[in-house]
Every structure is written in structure tokens, then in C-alpha cells.
Amino acid sequence: MTVIQHLIKELKMIAHPEGGHFSESFRDENNNVSLIYYMLQKNEWSHWHRLTKNEILHFYKGDPITIFMSKDGIDFTSVTLGENENFHFVVEANNWFAMQSNGRFSLIGCTVAPGFDYADFELAPKNWKPKNFTLNNTKI
């Protein structure tokens, strides 16, 4: 069993609608806060989406992960989480964002307060991306 298979099994992860795998590890009884494990493997993307709440992303294990963000749907910025990078980052409410692992896999945690609710989640149309989005200086 590979490390990836082991983590998916041990953390009881399932496929996430935005891509990758996840499992909820904590939600308080009043839904004041929720926490999930989230994993992306090589060649997987967290599809562009946004929340109406701030989301804190925490790096746990594996390869660095890049978070791409856009406030206006035109321009974008990025930040990398990883062992020799940032350990956590806050994606502010209503910002579009997507993620990609920079290696075999990346395991992160995602904390939302008040707790996550799919009513606060918007998944962008399938081929949507910020107008000026580039990857490795190649406009896509």
C-alpha cells in the first residue's frame, strides 16, 4: 500500500466535488468551526471555487502545494504551502481559488469558521479561470 493509499484509507477520505479527496475531522456542535483533511495527488487540481467565509489552509505532509487566487476574476496571485514554505495561509472570503500539488501528493487541512456549509460554496463553471491566469509563464 502506498503512502497515498494509506492516508486515504486511514483518514477515511472520499472524492471531493472540487477535485482531490477529503474527510471532515472536526465540526463543533454549534457549527462555529469545521476542519477537513484535503489531499491532491499529482496531476489533480482543486477546481476554481470560492466561499463566503475565510478559509485557513494548513500544510501537513507531502510535497508543496500552490494556491492560486483571484479577487476579480481577471488577475491572480499565488502562494505556496510546504515544509520549506508557508505552513498556513488564509484565503479571504469571496476570493476565487484553486490549488495544485507540486509533486506526488500534498495533504493539507482546511479550517472554516463559522463551519463550512455547501450553501456558502460556489464551484466555477468547468473551464472557468481568471482571464490572465498563467501557469509557468504560459497563459492558459
Give the predicted meaning of each segment.
Residues 1-90, 98, 103-140:
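Non-catalytic, conserved peripheral segments adjacent to functional cores
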